[in-house]
Amino acid sequence: MGLSRKKIFTWPLLLTGMAVVSTTFSSCSVFNFFSNLPTTTDNNNYGPTVQNLSAFLPTSDYKKIYDLSFSLEFNNSGGYNPSRLMSNNEGVTAENVNRPYRVFGTGWLFDWQAQPVDENDQNAKWTGYFATNLHVAEALLNPLDNKNYRPAWYKNELPLPGVDQTLYFNLGKWDENLAVQNKHNPKSLTYLPLSNLPKTVYTATSFYKESPKWITPIEADNPGIREYIDFAVLSITLDLSWTMRNGEKVHRYNDEYQLYNRWIMPAMNVAKALWDNKGVLNQPATPPNKKEEDDQLTDQLPYHGFFDRSNYTNPNVSLNNFSVYLGGYPYYANWPTTPQYTKFSVPSLSRRQIPITSDSRGSPGWTINALNPTELDGQKIASSTSLSSTGGIRAGIYNADIARNFQLVYRNVKYKQYGYGYIIQNSNLSAGSSGSLALTSNNQALGIYFGTVSVDAKKEATFGLVASLFNPNKIQVNVVTGNNVFETDTIQPYDLIYGNDLMTDDYGSYIRSLQTLNLSSRLLTKIKDNLPKKEGSTNQANQQTNQTNRSTDATKKDSSSDETNKNPLAELLSDIFKNLPNWN
C-alpha cells in the first residue's frame, strides 16, 4: 500500500459478507484498518467466528427480517473483467479468471413498483427494489443493465465472447419445513433461477457533488479517490404473465408466480407495516432513547418510517435503549447440517439452459445473530471497542473515513469507504451474509451489515459492522495521523435514501436515481403525494402537508436558489427533502 507512516497496530477488515465460489476456491475480501493511536486491541471482542443460530426461525423480530430477506446468487461466466483483477481480494489470477464462478449475498425488500399487480393483466409483472451491499452488487454483470451501472468495458448491450457476464440469477429463501426436499412443487420452492436478470437502480458511489476532503495519509495514498458506502439497490422483476388454456389460467412461469405469492406477498406486508410504523407489530418494547431523569434535554424519538433517522452520533441520544437484530444467508463450506437447496431449471420459454446442480460444500443457510434459542432479544451495540475509540465519534460507532484501507473496486474504479456505522456485538454472520438488514427493537432499519474485522488470518472479531445510511449533521473529529500530528476529519451530511443538497441531482440517492431512471416506486409515489399543494389547495390539504416529517439536514440551501430554479428535478427533490412522507 506504500505506507510511509509508523503503524501502531493493524486490523484487517474482513468483508465476511460475500462468498465467492468457483471450482477451485472460496474466499472473502480482506482489507486493513490502520490507526496511529497507541492502544491495544480488545481481546474480549476477538475470537473464533461466533456460532450463531442457523436454520432456526423464531417468531419474534427475527421473523420480520426473515420475511424481508432473500439469498442472492449470481452465476457468472468468468472471462474478461478488469474489476476482479483490480480487486486482488477474491483469489483471482490470470490463470483462473476465465473460470465460471458464483457469488452469494443477502438482499432485503423495502420498496416496489407503484401500481399493484393486476391479476387480470395477461402480461403482468412485479418489480421490487432490494437493498444489498455494493460489493455484492458488483457481481451483477447484466448486459442490459441501466446504462449508468453497466460495465464500461461492455461498450454496448451485447458483450463479446470471452467477457465476464451474469448467465443467470437465483433468488432463494430458507424454508424451515421444506429446506431439504427434491419434489418439484410450489411448497418445496427454495431456490429459483429467474427469467429476468436483476438491474442496478442505485449505488452509493461518488454521491457528493464535490469530492470529500480526506485526511492526509489517505489522500497521499490515493489522490482524488471518491467516496462510497457499502450500499446498493437492485431491481428484481418477476414475470407473472399468463394465458388461457382449456378454460384455465396458466402462468408462463408458474414457479415465479408461486414465489410471488409464497415469499413476496409476506415481504410486502411486513415492509408496509414497518413503513407505517404503527400498530401492535411496530410498538417498541421500551420507549426508545429514554433520557436520564436528571437530563434536561428533550428526548429524541426515531422518525416514523422504515429507516431509523435518529442522530445517534449525538452523545445525548442513547445507544443503549434498543437491540439490533440481524439475519442473513451465510455460505457454509462443509457445514455439518448443510441445507441443500432445491434448484429448478428455468422453463424452456426462457431459452436458457440452466442445469440443476448441487454443491456438496454447502449452500447459503438462514442465520441470525442469536447464540441460542432462549436468547432472542437481539444484540446490543458494542460500546467498549478500540475500533470506535480510534474513530473519535463516540463509543459504539466506527469512523470509516480514517480506515485507511476500507476500499472497494466497483466497475473498475477504486473507491474509499465514507461515513460511519455501528459495531454490533456477537454479530459476525460469516460469508454470504453481506447486505443483511439491521433491524432495531424500535422496528426500524438501523443500516446494512457488511462485515467484521480481524486481527489476523485466524482471529476474527465477534462483532459485526453495520453501515449507516444516514448522517444528519456535519461531524468533525480530531484524529492522530502521525507522531504528535493531529488532523480534523470531517464527515458531511448524507442521506442515501432521500438525498440532500450536497449530493448529486442524478444518482446521488436512491430517490434521485429512481427519478433519473424514470422508474415507478411506491415510496416515490407517497413522497409526491405528500408534497406541498399548488395554489388553490384546501386548508385540509395544507394541514396534511404540515404534518410531514422535516429533513434534519442543517446544511440545506434555500429552495429558491438559482440552481434549484433552473433544474426541475432539483426543484422537485428540494421539496422532497423538506417534506419527507408521513406514513400514517
UniProtKB/Swiss-Prot annotation:
Keywords: Cell membrane, Lipoprotein, Membrane, Palmitate, Signal. Residues 530-570 are annotated as: Disordered. A lipid is attached at C28 (S-diacylglycerol cysteine). Pfam families: Mycop_pep_DUF31. Its main location: membrane. It is found in: Cell membrane. It is a lipid-anchor. Transmembrane segments: none annotated. Residues 1-27 form the signal peptide. Residues 553-565 have a biased composition (Basic and acidic residues). A lipid is attached at C28 (N-palmitoyl cysteine). Residues 538-552 have a biased composition (Low complexity). GO terms for cellular component: plasma membrane. It comes from the Bacteria. NCBIfam families: Ig_SerProt_MIP. Belongs to the MG067/MG068/MG395 family. This is Uncharacterized lipoprotein MYCGA2980.
